């Protein structure tokens, strides 16, 4: 707990934050300054609950992922863009997959996301 208080680098909870209750406990203990939200780690409804608890507690937010393909990464990008308030974005794991049949409309080289052309839905199409 002392690390987060003494560090100028924001300490971010990753695997230790799987539920809204975890986020609340981490905030109450002042254990971290940020929470890494991952849809595949917690699921959509729990991720939304974690988001709201973290915002209410004044914690910074990060959107990330496990080793997921373009569908999951694109959905996470849309979630983060729609909710707002994210200080850190780590949605590049789709770039690590050498071959898949999908084209993510927002993911570009160098892990840059551009959702400006997005329409209804997640925007994934077959190549």
Locate each region found by the language model.
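Flexible C-terminal active-site loop/helix
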Residues: 66-127
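Catalytic core of soluble alpha/beta enzymes
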Residues: 1-74, 98-107
